[in-house]
C-alpha cells in the first residue's frame, strides 16, 4: 500500500529535495506527467503567465513493496530514504549495469556514498529517476539491519571527512608514478649499454616485473578516483597506466572490479570468486554445466571498442620500439610473456590474500560495514608490506572507503577497528605470509584454485582464450557506460 507525499519547490524554482520528472514518463490527457504511473506532478500558473510554486506528488513506499522490485527488468533502490527506479537507466550507468542490479530492492545509501566522488554531479542523474520515498513509519534501512551500527558507521565517515582523510597527497602519487617510469627506463638503459645476453635479460625482467606490478597498483587507485579531484582526469590516467603501460583493458577491469567492491565475496555477484569456467569448488557453488561456444558473438573483436583496442595496442607498440632493436620481434614477445609470467603470482597474491580466506556466501543483504568486514581481512603494516601490496594490506579500510587515498588507510584503521569492536565484528589482521590461511582445512585448496584462476585469466594468451572459450565470464567492457561519464 502506498500513500503520497508532496515536495515543494523553493521560491527560486529549485526543487527542495531530489525529485524531477522521470525522462521516460507517460502523460495523462490533462497534461500531467506520471512517473512510471506511480507519481504525479502538477504546476500552478499565475495570472501574469509566470509559473507559480510547482509541486511534486510522490508515492511513499514500504520496504516490503520495494523489495519486490529486484529483477533485471524491474530495479528499484533506496538512497537516503528516496526511492529510485533505475530500470531504464541501468545500461547507461558509468559503473556498469550489474552494479545497480546487484542492489535492486535494497538500501544503497552507503555503497552510493562510498563509490562516488562528486555527489553533486551524481545526484543530477538521480533526479529524473526519483519515484517516491520511504513511508514515515519505515526505518531508513531494511528492518533486519542494525540502525545503530549503520548510524555509527555514517558518523565515522563524517568524522573522517572532517579530519581530511579523503584529501590527496600529490607528492605520494607522483613518487609512485616516478618509480614506475624510472624502473622501465632503467631496464632499457641496461639493455642498451650491456646488450641482450641472458643475465641481462633475466635482470631486466625482474625490473620490468616490479614496474608492471606497481603500475597495476597505481591504476587501481586511479580506477577508484582517489588520486585526482576530477574523475575525468583519473579515468584518463588509468587508461594510460592500465592500457598503455600494461596492455590491459580498463573497461574490462572496471566492469569486474566495481562488482567485486559492491558485493564482496557474494556468490555469484562477485566475479572475483567465480572460478566456474575452470573449477567447481567450495560449499556454495553448484555443479555448473557449461559449453564452449565457438561463434562470432564471442570473438574478442566483439568485446573491445576501437578506442580500447588502440590503447591496448599502444602497449605492444611501445615495447617493440624499446626492446625490438635488441631482441627482434619474437624475442620481444618472449620478453613480454616472461614479465607477465613473473608478475601474475605477485598480483594474484595481493588481490586474493584478503578475501579468499574470509566468508563467502550467497546474498545476505547485510549493512555496508558488516558486509565488508566479514568478507575482508588486513595484512600487518610494515614499510615492505605497504610497498609490496600498494597499501592494499589495509583492505578493510579500502573496501569501506574506496575513494580514500591509500596513504591514509593506516591513519583510519584504529578508528575502524574500534567501531568493529563496539559492534562485535571481528577485525582480522594477519602476517603477510599467513594471509591466505583460514580456519577451515578446505580453504587452502580453495585459495589455490582461486589463485590459479586469476593467473590463467591474466596471462597474455588468456586475453584471447577467455573470450573464445569462456563466455560465461562475461568480460565485455562497458564502453557504452563510459560514454555517458560526467564531464567535469
Residue ranges with predicted function:
Residues 112-113, 332-334, 400-405:
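Active-site rim elements
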Residues 138-139, 170-176, 254-256, 270-274:
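Short coil/turn segments at secondary-structure boundaries
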Amino acid at each position: 500500500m502506498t500513500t503520497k507525499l508532496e515536495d515543494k519547490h523553493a521560491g527560486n524554482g529549485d526543487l527542495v529535495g531530489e525529485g524531477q520528472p522521470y525522462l521516460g514518463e507517460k502523460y495523462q490527457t490533462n497534461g500531467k506527467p506520471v512517473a512510471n504511473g506511480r507519481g504525479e506532478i502538477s504546476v500552478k500558473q499565475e495570472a501574469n503567465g509566470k509559473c507559480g510554486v510547482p509541486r511534486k506528488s510522490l508515492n511513499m513506499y514500504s520496504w516490503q513493496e520495494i523489495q519486490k522490485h529486484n529483477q533485471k527488468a524491474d530495479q528499484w533502490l533506496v538512497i537516503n530514504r528516496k526511492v529510485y527506479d533505475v530500470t531504464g537507466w541501468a545500461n547507461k550507468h558509468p559503473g556498469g549495469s550489474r552494479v545497480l542490479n546487484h542492489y535492486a530492492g535494497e538500501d544503497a545509501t552507503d555503497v552510493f556514498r562510498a563509490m562516488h566522488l562528486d555527489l553533486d554531479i551524481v545526484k543530477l542523474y538521480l533526479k529524473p529517476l526519483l519515484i517516491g520515498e520511504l513511508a514515515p513509519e519505515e526505518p531508513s534501512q531494511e528492518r533486519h539491519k542494525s540502525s545503530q551500527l549503520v548510524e555509527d558507521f555514517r558518523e565515522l565517515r563524517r568524522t573522517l571527512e572532517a579530519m581530511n582523510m579523503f584529501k590527496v597527497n600529490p607528492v605520494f602519487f607522483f613518487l609512485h608514478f616516478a618509480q614506475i617510469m624510472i624502473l622501465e627506463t632503467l631496464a632499457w638503459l641496461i639493455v642498451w649499454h650491456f646488450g641482450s645476453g641472458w643475465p641481462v635479460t633475466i635482470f631486466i625482467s625482474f625490473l620490468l616485473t616490479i614496474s608492471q606490478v606497481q603500475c597495476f597498483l597505481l591504476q587501481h587507485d586511479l580506477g577508484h578516483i582517489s588520486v585526482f579531484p576530477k574523475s575525468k582526469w583519473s579515468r584518463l590516467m588509468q587508461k594510460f597506466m592500465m592500457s598503455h603501460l600494461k596492455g590491459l583493458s580498463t573497461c574490462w577491469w572496471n566492469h569486474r572490479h566495481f562488482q567485486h567492491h559492491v558485493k564482496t565475496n557474494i556468490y555469484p555477484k562477485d566475479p572475483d570468486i567465480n572460478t566456474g569456467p575452470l573449477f567447481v569448488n567450495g560449499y556454495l557453488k553448484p555443479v555448473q554445466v557449461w559449453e564452449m561456444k565457438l561463434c562470432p558473438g564471442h570473438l574478442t573483436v566483439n568485446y573491445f571498442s576501437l578506442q580500447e583496442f588502440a590503447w591496448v595496442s599502444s602497449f605492444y607498440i611501445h615495447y617493440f620500439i624499446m626492446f625490438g632493436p635488441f631482441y627482434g620481434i619474437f624475442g620481444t614477445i618472449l620478453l613480454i610473456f616472461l614479465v607477465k609470467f613473473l608478475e601474475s603470482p605477485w598480483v594474484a597474491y595481493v588481490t586474493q590474500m584478503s578475501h579468499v580466506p574470509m566468508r563467502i556466501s550467497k546474498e545476505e543483504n547485510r549493512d555496508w560495514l558488516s558486509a565488508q568486514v566479514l568478507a575482508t581481512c588486513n595484512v600487518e603494516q610494515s614499510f615492505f608490506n605497504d610497498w609490496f601490496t600498494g597499501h592494499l594490506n589495509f583492505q578493510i579500510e579500502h573496501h569501506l572507503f574506496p575513494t580514500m587515498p591509500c596513504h591514509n588507510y593506516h591513519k583510519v584503521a584504529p578508528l575502524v577497528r574500534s567501531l568493529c569492536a563496539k559492534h562485535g565484528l571481528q577485525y582480522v589482521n594477519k602476517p603477510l605470509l599467513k594471509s591466505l590461511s583460514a580456519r577451515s582445512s578446505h580453504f587452502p585448496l580453495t585459495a589455490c584454485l582461486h589463485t590459479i584462476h586469476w593467473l590463467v585469466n591474466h596471462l597474455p594468451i588468456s586475453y584471447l582464450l577467455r573470450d573464445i572459450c569462456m563466455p560465461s565470464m562475461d568480460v565485455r567492457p562497458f564502453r557504452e557506460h563510459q560514454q555517458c561519464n560526467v564531464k567535469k
